[in-house]
Curated annotation (Swiss-Prot):
Record-level GO cellular component terms: cell outer membrane; transporter complex
InterPro entries in UniProt: LipoPS_assembly_LptD, LptD, LptD_C
Protein name: LPS-assembly protein LptD
Keywords: Cell outer membrane, Membrane, Signal
KW Kinase (keyword) present: no
Biological process terms in GO annotation: Gram-negative-bacterium-type cell outer membrane assembly; lipopolysaccharide transport
Cleavable signal peptide: 1-27
Chief location bin: membrane
Native organism: Psychrobacter arcticus (strain DSM 17307 / VKM B-2377 / 273-4)
Function: Together with LptE, is involved in the assembly of lipopolysaccharide (LPS) at the surface of the outer membrane.
Family stated for the protein in its record: Belongs to the LptD family.
């Protein structure tokens, strides 16, 4: 929320007014010389201070901005217990004493660990020194009463002892007290300084006058539970958590408070948030009652006070804690003191409650869309539903209107609509562009484990997802799902019932031709899937699979005859697993049944009678899966370096499978395909993905896995190799084509993962054909020299496979995220197809980050995944981020998270 730090500062200012009432209960005064009271100034309508006065307040506030880049903001200038000590004490109380395992292995040092250790900011806001007299007075008070001194760490401020000191003091033992000359008041983590503090309960007036300074450290506002949560999250807290915990410093000329009405007024207030590293001022602050606040001439920025690159200025701000809303009037956003945009009125939240109003605008620049400005408006329609309406303004397109509607019901679930409309797009031959996405989720309140979901997706054209950063979908998708689904599970059954259709976008098939109706997926109208197990036999595992559906695909372009109908598939299996620490053996028997029936339209189109349109087939299957485990302690590199320790595990495996041949050439294929080859697939019961074919498979598969795990539990090497050998040729085909499995073996398959250094990972997988030519190989090398840098290099080469519709590809992939110094970094990623001599996707950019703001400029050139023959899209994008405002997620970070392996932890380290 934009002005929540302002609201937090007001709360702290009022501590100075509200906390003064406790002076009537306890006060420790250095000198008790009696003195006559001076007239008390209570008029809150004095002439506003001039600009020099507010500048004086800012100068006083700047005393707490320390120019030491290595300073810990939570502990600077503190002589008492700090945040780290508090977290350590809590962590020690929560965690049992353990023996630390030293780190083993080493890091690869090809690049410097850090390029530039200079801080991003020239300084930071720090708390003032703790008053040493406070703890001393607390200790002495406890000793005089024969009681131990209270532990102030974690003690709520309203329960902590109050201590006051000054040069002069007066108290009439009834209802009047006055302190003057270097007045200091401490209670817990709250601290006030002033030239004079007066309390007159008879007139209901309290006042702090002359160079008022107040602070409330965040550690004092965090409860024990909050602090414990912070420790368990490695000390990281969200922006909202930080704002709620306080951690503020404020200075003012004076503060007046009416103890009867609750009205208070302060002038020339300057404040800083240590937790948020933000600061600002208000020329005048007035609190007419306990729930309303009025500020005049307000400024807020997260930049250093010595170099304020941006700031928000408002003529006035009104806050209401009852409604949870604030109103800003005549607000101007400035960059380098130059006005950038102006809002005459702005309504915003000051707590977690929702309310209607404008949200923070977004802006970006690209060569395709030009300048894009998004202005969202939020509608708080009811506690259980709301809406957001956004206007997108482009310099190269007509404006787009998009909306989001969210709802939550007590018994019928929750959902969200997203839609957009752009009329007469100048960049798309004047066509209208539109989209609609809907998602609904439901869980039964009366039947446990019963849930449901619904999904709808629609776009106007195949390029829509490519042109716009769409809510609901981030990548190009050929088939957009539309479905309604029910799910249920318990200890014995896991089932789903769904109806599903698709919107298929215009695209090219594998032959470079436009997709035809025959290439589109079947609709399921409906489909019922059940996975179940029967608890009849104690030592046997009896399981079953049932898949029943009506498949429909309309053929309107004459690309083939329509083949729609019903399919019923059932499989019942019984196994007797025998397992031990040294190995296992799992024999299994299965019986499969497949029944299909064409519908009336398909019978006519294919000139079939009803009997020919019905097909039924039974196929039994038997298999034995066995493996051994050989364990040996120590490192395989012990002859060279035995410091890694750990153990090695060698696991050979052998599986035998037999299922006979049954002719299935007259059975339609609704949604079945042949699986791609990989290590795990070699040990499955079938090569068909789907239930339109029951494979005849007579084969045995030997394989072996070797793993090395070091002393800290890190898997340094995990490698597997296997090959499937066929005793009989396979005769079942998908679509009356030649048999697929007629060779002697599948070819050799391997899969390895290695971590030779603590910051280097290497993955290699591949397969050979049965003649031991290359089928495919993929490699991925990841090097992370530091927490905020990353380098990836990958290679993939695969041959054409007509059985799986695998296209040939020879491509290199590379990505890099590395800092130039502590403020600048380079971002790059690319995918190059050297068979086509074509860069399929490339991005390069620079990113800047400091304590005040950040920006990125990057260029991207890429092809539409749905039509690689089209010309590539080229875009130059720019984005600006303001520290402390917005979610921190941008189009660039979302794109890189999808394209760059391991980007998200690197991004978190860079932001921290």
């Amino acid at each position: 929320m934009l002005y929540s730090p302002l609201y937090q500062s007001i709360r702290l200012i009022l501590f100075g007014a509200l906390g003064l009432s406790s002076l009537t209960v306890s006060a420790a005064i250095n000198q008790t010389d009696s003195m006559m009271p001076e007239p008390l100034v209570t008029d809150s309508s004095n002439q506003y201070a001039d600009d020099e006065s507010i500048q004086e307040s800012l100068k006083r506030l700047a005393e707490f901005y320390e120019r030491t880049p290595d300073t810990n903001v939570a502990t600077s200038n503190n002589t008492g217990t700090n945040v780290s000590d508090e977290q350590s004490n809590i962590q020690n109380s929560l965690t049992p004493v353990t023996t630390n395992i030293p780190t083993v292995g080493s890091n690869l040092r090809l690049l410097p660990h850090t390029v530039d250790s200079a801080a991003r900011c020239e300084g930071q806001w720090v708390y003032p020194k703790k008053n040493p007299n406070y703890q001393r007075a607390v200790n002495e008070a406890g000793a005089s009463n024969g009681q131990p001194a209270p532990n102030l760490n974690g003690l709520p401020n309203n329960q902590a002892p109050l201590f006051a000191e000054s040069d002069y003091g007066y108290y009439d033992n009834v209802d009047y007290a006055e302190l003057s000359g270097n007045v200091i008041i401490d209670q817990g983590t709250q601290h006030i300084e002033a030239e004079k503090i007066v309390l007159d309960l008879s007139n209901g007036v309290a006042a702090a006058q002359g160079k008022v300074m107040f602070t409330d450290q965040a550690t004092g506002n965090a409860s024990a539970t909050q602090t414990q949560d912070r420790v368990q999250k490695n000390g990281k807290t969200s922006l909202t958590d930080k704002a709620a915990q306080g951690g503020l410093i404020g200075v003012a000329d004076n503060l007046n408070y009416n103890t009867e009405t609750g009205q208070s007024t302060a002038t020339n207030v300057a404040f800083a948030s240590v937790e948020l590293q933000a600061h600002g001022y208000a020329k005048r602050l007035n609190r007419p009652n306990e729930s309303q606040y009025e500020l005049d001439e307000v400024m807020y920025s997260t930049c250093p006070p010595t170099n304020r690159k941006w700031q928000f200025d408002a003529k006035s701000i009104d806050l209401d804690t009852e409604t949870g809303r604030g109103e800003a009037y005549n607000t101007t956003f400035r960059i380098a003191d130059v006005p950038v945009f102006y809002l005459p009125y702005f309504n915003f939240p000051i707590d977690s409650r929702r309310g209607s109003g404008f949200l923070l605008p977004n802006a970006s620049i690209s060569s395709e869309n030009g300048l894009e400005v998004d202005v969202p408006y939020y509608f708080n329609l009811a506690p259980n539903y709301d809406a957001t309406l956004s206007t997108h303004i482009y310099t190269t397109r007509n404006p787009m209107l998009s909306g989001e509607f969210r709802y939550l019901t007590e018994n019928y679930g929750e959902g969200i609509f997203n839609g957009s409309y752009l009329p007469n797009d100048k960049e798309y031959d004047g066509e209208d562009r539109r989209s609609l996405f809907y998602d609904h989720y439901w869980s039964s309140t009366s039947i446990p484990r019963l849930s449901g979901e619904a999904k709808y997706s629609h776009v106007s054209d195949a390029d829509y997802l490519n042109d716009f950063d769409t809510l609901g979908l981030s990548d190009n998708t050929l088939n957009l799902a539309r479905r309604a689904q029910l799910n249920y599970y318990n200890d014995y059954v896991d089932g789903e019932l769904k109806v599903e259709t698709f919107q298929t976008l215009d695209a090219l098939n594998n032959n470079g031709q436009m997709l035809q109706d025959k290439d589109k997926p079947y609709s399921r109208l409906p489909q019922l899937n059940l996975d179940y197990r029967l608890p009849w036999a104690k030592n046997f595992d009896i399981t079953g699979v049932s898949d029943s559906a009506y498949f429909k695909k309309s053929i309107d372009d004459g690309s083939e005859n329509e083949k729609s109908g019903t399919r019923f598939y059932n499989k019942l299996s019984a196994s007797y697993p025998m397992e031990n620490s040294w190995g296992y053996i799992k024999p299994k028997l299965s019986l499969q049944h497949l029944f299909t029936s064409y519908d009336k339209d398909s019978l006519v189109d294919n000139s079939l009678d009803k009997d020919d349109g019905n097909q039924s087939v039974f196929v039994p299957q038997a298999s034995i899966d066995a493996g051994l485990h050989f364990y040996q302690a120590g490192s395989p590199f012990g002859a060279f370096d035995d410091t890694l320790g750990g153990y090695r595990l060698l696991s050979p495996r052998l599986k035998y499978t037999y299922s006979p041949f049954k002719d299935q050439n007259n059975i339609p294929n609704f949604n079945t395909r042949i699986a791609s080859i990989n290590y795990e697939q070699l040990f499955s019961d079938s090569w068909f993905l789907g239930h339109d074919r029951l494979q005849d498979l007579h084969a045995f598969t030997p394989g072996i896995n070797y793993r090395y795990i070091d002393a800290t539990g890190v898997t340094r090497f995990d490698g597997s190799i296997a090959e499937q050998f066929y005793i009989d040729d396979g005769g079942v085909t998908l679509d009356n084509t030649k048999p697929v499995f007629t060779s002697s073996s599948s070819g050799l398959v391997w899969d390895t993962s290695t971590q030779p250094y603590n910051n280097v990972w290497v993955d290699v997988s591949g397969a050979l054909t049965n003649s031991y030519d290359l089928n495919y190989i993929t490699t991925e090398l990841r090097y992370q020299p530091s927490d905020n840098s990353l380098f990836n290099v990958g290679f993939i080469k695969r041959q054409r496979d007509e059985n799986t519709n695998q296209l040939p590809l020879s491509a290199l992939t590379a990505s890099a995220v590395f800092p130039i110094n502590n403020n600048w970094r380079v971002l790059a990623q690319g995918q190059y197809d050297y068979n086509r001599n074509q860069m399929l996707d490339s991005l390069i950019g620079i990113d800047y980050e400091d304590c005040c703001f950040g920006f990125a400029v990057y260029g991207r050139r890429y092809y539409n995944d749905l039509n690689i023959a089209d010309k590539p899209t080229q875009a130059i994008m720019a984005e600006v981020r303001l520290s402390g405002l917005g979610s921190g997620s941008s189009r660039l970070t979302r794109l890189l998270a999808d394209k760059v392996l391991g980007f998200e932890p690197v991004q978190s380290a860079w932001k921290d």
